[in-house]
Amino acid sequence: MIVMKFGGTSVQDAQAIDRVAAIVRERLHERPVVVVSALAKITDQLLAMSSAAGAGKREKALELSRAARERHYNCACDLLGTHAFEQIAPELEADFDGLDELLRGVVAVGELTPRTIDTIAGFGERVSSKIAAAAFSQRNIEAAHVDSRKCIVTDASFGKAVPQFEETDARLAETVKPLLERKRVPVMGGFIASTREGIGTTLGRGGSDFSAAIIGAGLNAERIEIWTDVDGMMTTDPNLCPDARRIKNISFEEAAELAYFGAKVLHPATLLPAIQKNIPVLILNSRNPKCEGTRITATAPKSKNIFKAIAAKKRITVVDVVATRMLMAHGFLKSIFEVFANHRCPVDMVSTSEVSVSVTVDSNESIAAIAADLAKLADVKYEGRKAIVCLVGENIKSTPGIAAKVFSAIPDANIHMISQGASEINIGFVIDEDAVPDVVSRLHRTFFSQVDPEVFA
């Protein structure tokens, strides 16, 4: 069996879902499980209505909900026709009525908890999966809607819940396997899960990819397909560099580094369950299904190019901690990293010297609070509007003088930090955010003007 995950732009309207149904039909002989995201932009709209309700703006929240309701009704009606839509309409109506009730409740209580945000944020996938299942059935695909919250079990870390794989695997075997055995196509919402007590959670933004990998690993899928609106993983962001090339084959390790450092095609956590079970992951384009996309496997063919790709991660803050007397004291570095851990703030890059330690983190609203806690230990300063540029490729470890080659291509760039990853397959550095287009373009011209046809398209 295989898992096919379709992102928000792949299910953004009736025409897109119709395309998805045609793609799924081509794969029926492989016993697919289909995972769908919310309709494009709906999660943002849901978060906006939850914020409005939390701020006591009742009418604003309900107005956004009305717009979302209308969009889903129109999409379902266009897909199914009036008669079939009338069969699904009562269920959709009950779902949206429940959403409105929840929004009114938030306004009445005057409190918006992380638990409630998760309940509201995951609404899009609950509804899109029902609409997709109904559309498949009408197109002679024997589909069955499966509520992912009954299958994927997580802890109660609302906003970015952590899967409990053993319990999840057991529930998938109980719920999804019997449908596959009866030649049905299970249709599930991505991103959403629940605690073992049944409280709704989400897997973090972009978590539908993660859902697909969790389901694929739990059911020992032959492969996991991530369907997007691009032809696969590219040598860099085509918006920054129009001559970016498609990567045909890439290793799990290289893809994970790229996903972590800003390649938006893939959620960084997606690959972990797939790596553990050695399940290939394919990145494909629902608007161009004939394209072979990118294949991610444990080991990829050797490339004649040093690098596989260049990624840029914006909205980075550099935090400098200076402590002339304390830095080498026993346990001091541990104290620094505990501050970041307590704020649930992951660190990207680290650089140490005799008297200071510099780290990069994603820019967010908790930076000031982190700095205040660090100031109890040492002198602290931080600067935002930075970006990490990362070059990834397994040939890095066997190429001498790699840093010299990279930095001679961008001699006038203002570089704040340099790091070579412990994996030895990436070299990263920090620059000003507004320098990203120029730096990435020059690096791409230097390292990808000629490419290995076995690895790049």
Protein language model regions, located:
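Nucleotide/pyrophosphate-binding catalytic subdomain
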Residues: 1-266, 271, 430-432, 451, ...
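Glycine-rich beta-alpha junction loops
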Residues: 39-40, 150, 230-232, 281, ...
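Short hydrophobic alpha-helical runs that function as membrane-insertion/retention elements
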Residues: 223-227, 281-283, 348
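A conserved active-site cap/scaffold subdomain adjacent to cofactor or substrate pockets
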Residues: 251-297, 302-322
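A conserved regulatory-domain signal marking ACT and ACT-like small-molecule sensing domains
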Residues: 290-457
